[in-house]
């Protein structure tokens, strides 16, 4: 049985509660029709740790109300947040209150509601922490965009070879943040989204810049002559504004944003945010997303400590640390059990309102992992790879950068987008090799830009004997010198854990 409230209220308190509930309730539009289509969630799994059932009744429903409001003073502004199970989906409402007395009474009332699975008291807090940084780094361009030279992270992650395998087409990544500005480099890939704070259907407003920067890392268009490129340049971004211009907000708004993103069909949810509070509404929303087959990626925090940061610390969420250009874990990056993976997060060039800027933080590392998840989902659908375990592909293919093996600073290692795609089977799909002979030079060309080990063989009698072994250049081309005349040669791309064997047709030296 649900707890029933009894006893008289202090004079005027009943009216105050009624007013709080009347004007302070907000909830996600859970019944809204999908605006982005079906991203084939059934084709992708995210195993790892099994998240708790979001609909399991939390201890907060039966806890004494005064324990939930103990941190409030007489004049503190707060929210009483309730998570309800409505037809198998979470509905999260929030009542604005002032002071401990009013908050306690509202908590008791919400605990008695049929279908309540969690009740929380929240205060507004800062949930983002990006660090602007100037940079003059240069290097080989991965696109024709003007800021491509400054995008060292794309080269480290092997974006070019990755794009020959997948580009994010057909996938949507929700960015739950300070909103996303309508910048030219994002316009083609930016959906309308939702503004949770204002309660309107448009998340394309960012008075902070954090969310716009994150979105650009994921899906800025490539080769359009503007700015730089995102790691998944053809993925769509679903902007959800849950934090204000100062990067502050309530966990209930973030939770509502997560539920909205799931209901709108986003396959990947990026949370470049974090706090030290394990909030039941946030936990329920994250578990709802994971149970719905979504990939949830979150920053582990920038304090340089081992403190747990939520939502990164929740089971099933991919927690991301930050590395620098030298593949070292950044000094500011948090460590601990929440860290599953690391990604570039120092001097990251991306879009901001009105232009471009270089930021550092685990907030900047997180969208690289989200973008790679979108690439994996895109490849799974386009190439018919079947069920892909995103977390397993990311971790199995990571580059070891800290202590050998899995460690508390970098998790499984530094992200490699190309390696992750290969681990999922995308590299072997459709790989072909063509060989040609001219003046005793045998040239082999693969049908994609990739470095592969290739073997030159010569026919001796009825058998093929190995002559030479080398790797193709990044362009997928390798050249062998042959000496014997009137002999048949062929090139073999040997089978590996990533590729199936490919054999060219025999050629003769004339």
Question: Which sequence ranges carry the predicted segments?
Answer:
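Primarily auto-inhibitory N-terminal propeptides
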Residues: 2, 13, 19-139
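Protease zymogen maturation seam
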Residues: 34-38, 112-172, 180, 184-185, ...
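Subtilisin-like serine protease catalytic core
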Residues: 33-37, 161-192, 200-251, 267, ...
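C-terminal subdomain of the subtilisin-like protease fold in secreted/lumenal serine endopeptidases
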Residues: 253, 264-271, 280-281, 285, ...
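Substrate-binding/access-modulating region of protease and related hydrolase catalytic domains
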Residues: 163, 168-169, 239-316, 326-329, ...
């Amino acid at each position: 049985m649900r707890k029933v409230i009894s006893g008289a209220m202090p004079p005027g308190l009943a009216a105050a509660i009624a007013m709080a509930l009347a004007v302070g309730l907000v909830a996600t539009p859970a019944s809204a029709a999908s605006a982005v289509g079906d991203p084939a969630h059934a084709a992708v799994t995210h195993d790892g740790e099994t998240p708790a059932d979001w609909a399991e009744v939390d201890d907060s429903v039966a806890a004494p109300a005064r324990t939930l409001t103990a941190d409030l003073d007489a004049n503190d502004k707060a929210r009483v947040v309730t998570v309800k199970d409505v037809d198998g989906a979470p509905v999260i409402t929030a009542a604005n209150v002032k002071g401990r007395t009013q908050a306690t009474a509202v908590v008791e009332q919400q605990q008695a509601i049929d279908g309540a699975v969690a009740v929380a008291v929240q205060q507004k807090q800062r949930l983002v922490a990006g660090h602007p940084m100037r940079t003059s780094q240069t290097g080989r361009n991965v696109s024709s965009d003007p800021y491509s030279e400054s995008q060292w992270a794309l080269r480290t992650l092997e974006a070019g070879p990755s794009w020959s395998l997948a580009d994010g087409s057909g996938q949507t990544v929700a960015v739950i943040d300070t909103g996303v500005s309508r910048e030219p480099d994002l316009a083609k890939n930016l959906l309308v989204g939702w503004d949770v704070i204002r309660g309107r259907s448009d998340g394309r407003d960012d008075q902070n810049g954090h969310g716009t920067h994150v979105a650009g890392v994921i899906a800025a268009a490539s080769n359009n002559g503007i700015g730089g490129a995102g790691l998944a340049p053809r993925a769509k971004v679903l902007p959800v504004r849950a934090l204000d211009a100062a990067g502050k907000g309530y966990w209930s708004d973030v939770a509502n944003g997560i539920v909205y993103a799931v209901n709108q069909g986003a396959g990947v949810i990026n949370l470049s945010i974090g706090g030290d509070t394990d909030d039941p509404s946030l936990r329920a929303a994250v578990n709802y997303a994971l149970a719905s087959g979504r990939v949830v990626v979150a920053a582990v925090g920038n304090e340089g400590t081992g403190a747990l940061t939520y939502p990164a610390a929740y089971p099933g969420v991919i927690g991301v640390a930050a590395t620098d250009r030298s593949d070292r874990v950044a000094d500011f990056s948090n460590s601990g059990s929440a860290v599953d993976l690391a990604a570039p997060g120092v001097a990251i060039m991306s879009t901001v309102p009105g232009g471009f800027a270089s930021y550092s933080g685990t907030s900047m590392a997180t969208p690289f992992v989200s973008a790679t998840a979108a690439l994996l989902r895109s490849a799974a659908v386009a190439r018919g790879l079947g069920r892909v375990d995103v977390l397993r592909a990311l971790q199995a293919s990571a580059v070891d950068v800290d202590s050998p093996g899995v460690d508390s600073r970098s998790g499984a290692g530094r992200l490699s987008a190309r390696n992750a795609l290969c681990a999922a089977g995308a590299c072997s799909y459709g790989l072909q090799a063509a060989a040609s002979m001219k003046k005793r030079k045998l040239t082999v060309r693969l049908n994609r830009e990739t470095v592969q080990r290739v073997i030159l063989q010569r026919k001796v009698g009825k058998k093929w004997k190995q002559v030479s072994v080398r790797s193709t250049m990044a362009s997928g081309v390798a050249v062998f010198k042959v000496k014997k005349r009137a002999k048949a040669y062929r090139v073999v791309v040997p089978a590996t854990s990533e590729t199936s064997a490919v054999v060219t047709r025999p050629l003769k030296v004339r």
